[in-house]
A protein has these predicted regions:
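Metal-dependent phosphoesterase signature
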Residues: 5-51, 62
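Asp-based, Mg2+/Mn2+-dependent phosphohydrolase catalytic module
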Residues: 53-61, 73-196
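Structural motif
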Residues: 69-71
Length: 196
């Protein structure tokens, strides 16, 4: 919210509506409203993305541990974790910014917390898979192999909107997101989790 309010277009609209620049108090108030609304609907958005359950099953069959990082708070995860488990997804560990002094992505600390909890001795044994530029940056800052996932990503937009595009437009959008991930430093970019 703070970042958005610093965007010139949004700040200009704010000033037109309220007659003054936004303040830190405004940021806190907006975040409180956002969090309240999000908490009221969060349980509807805990379904694993396509191919995740199949990939997790294969990784576990190979003895690979799964740690997760999130931008959600612990309170939000208290809603998401049980719903995701009901749907069949349960990582071995997960960490939110609450676990690392409220310093989330793109900082690497949640990855390091996962490594410690899972007894992983080297960043060379870690693959970070994510669907945002912040995920990619988090992985790169941690020094781990980092994979960007295009379809279903926040960078791509809503699935329904994507599905409505022509094949040509889909390919353009895929390439745009692929380039964003590569520019952020992704070691690999895959179309969907099934390619992992």
């Amino acid at each position: 919210i703070r970042t958005m309010l610093h965007m010139p277009r949004i700040q200009k609209l704010w000033e037109e509506k309220y007659g003054q620049a936004s303040t830190e108090e405004d940021v806190e108030k907006l975040y409180g409203l956002f969090e309240e609304k999000l908490m009221s609907i969060l349980d509807r958005f805990a379904q694993p993305k396509p191919y995740v359950l199949e990939v997790v099953k294969e990784l576990r069959a190979r003895g690979i541990k799964i740690g997760s990082t999130t931008g959600y708070t612990d309170d939000m995860m208290a809603v998401v974790v049980p719903k995701a488990k009901e749907a069949g997804y349960e990582p071995d560990t997960w960490f939110s910014p609450d676990s690392v002094g409220h310093v989330g992505r793109p900082y690497p600390y949640m990855i390091f917390q996962n490594m410690e909890a899972l007894h992983v001795s080297s960043v060379e044994h870690v693959v970070k898979v994510g669907d945002t530029v912040s995920d990619i940056l988090e992985g790169k800052h941690a020094g781990v192999f980092t994979v960007g996932v295009v379809e279903g990503s926040s960078e791509m937009g809503l699935t329904e909107e994507y599905d409505a595009l022509t094949q040509e437009k889909k390919e353009e959008k895929i390439e745009e997101v692929r380039q964003r991930f590569q520019k952020a430093g992704a070691d690999a970019v895959i179309l969907h989790m099934g390619e992992l």
